[in-house]
Amino acid sequence: MRVADFSFDLPDELIARYPMAQRNASRLLTLDGNSGALGDKQFTELLEMINPGDLMVFNNTRVIPARMFGQKASGGKLEILVERMLDDKRILAHVRSSKSPKVDSLIHLDGGYQMKMVARHDTLFELELLSELTILEVLEAVGHMPLPPYIDRPDEDADKERYQTVYNQNPGAVAAPTAGLHFDDAMLDALKAKGVNIAFVTLHVGAGTFQPVRVDNVLEHKMHSEWANVPQDVVDLIAQTKAAGKRVVAVGTTSVRSLESAARASLGELKAFSGDTDIFIYPGYQFQVVDAMVTNFHLPESTLIMLVSAFAGFDHVMAAYQHAITQKYRFFSYGDAMFVTKKAH
């Protein structure tokens, strides 16, 4: 299986650089994984497709303002993008500068804060904050929302709200779980009123989600790792849902990866899970937990389009993407959504 198989040509004007005025005003492309049938809908019509007793699982991670600017002691400018918080004072980060900072060197951040370069781990730098404050407090003071590179504009105040789900709770992501951006409080209330059950997992999306796949053969790709948590109450809800013959609907690929990681860690039997996951889902994968998913449109040759292809069938997904391009759907983080049901194996 070649990475190039997952390529498609996307006109630049279909990349959404701003969100819709209202969260749920996006369009929704439905894809039946078994038949390949497509439907052009509005996102609010998702309400009609989720049945009473179904369980919707959301990722409640909170995006941190993970991009900081500063300079080295030598005066050279640099940009820091947090990959993950190690504790209240230390981060693993991507550093962009003309020359990499050396071990023990100081970094002067905007706002007068200082960090020390502690160690290098492959392409990532371990940095320690020299302050009474916590990393989160400093990020809230001087950090910028880490908009994906393809949005191709500086972050604005509005992004602090809109590049964040309404149900976010646990800070730690450096990219939004974007399928969740379409849900507002009214829609969540309408789902509950219909008898749909709602549950939350956490997966702190890392910047690795934007790293291109750099191999030709899909099987050779090494997946980045991210921290996920699937609590016992969610496991119990899933068991009840399955026992009643209802569906588990994951909102976003991060929710899919969290649930499938928990099943993988206990050899197919779903148990509570907390820890790092590097699960890589591509065609041929047998899904253990998820029956349907809400997801945005993903980048060509990305691990995310591979995951959706594993779920609904490669040919069906690539045909759906061509349809979306023809119908001028909006792509990527601030774009439109899909509702996809699983292809039977």
From Swiss-Prot:
Family annotation (InterPro entries): QueA (IPR003699), QueA_dom1 (IPR042118), QueA_dom2 (IPR042119), QueA_sf (IPR036100)
Pathway per the UniProt entry: tRNA modification; tRNA-queuosine biosynthesis
A GO term for molecular function: S-adenosylmethionine:tRNA ribosyltransferase-isomerase activity
Keyword Cytoplasm assigned: yes
Gene Ontology cellular-component annotations: cytoplasm
Location (main, coarse): cytoplasm
Gene Ontology biological process terms from the UniProt entry: queuosine biosynthetic process; tRNA wobble guanine modification
EC number: 2.4.99.17
Localization per record: Cytoplasm
Reactions accelerated catalytically: 7-aminomethyl-7-carbaguanosine(34) in tRNA + S-adenosyl-L-methionine = epoxyqueuosine(34) in tRNA + adenine + L-methionine + 2 H(+)
Entry superkingdom: Bacteria
Gene3D superfamilies documented for this protein: QueA-like
Keyword terms: Cytoplasm, Queuosine biosynthesis, S-adenosyl-L-methionine, Transferase
Function: Transfers and isomerizes the ribose moiety from AdoMet to the 7-aminomethyl group of 7-deazaguanine (preQ1-tRNA) to give epoxyqueuosine (oQ-tRNA).
Family, similarity comment: Belongs to the QueA family.
Assembly information from the UniProt record: Monomer.
Name of the featured protein: S-adenosylmethionine:tRNA ribosyltransferase-isomerase
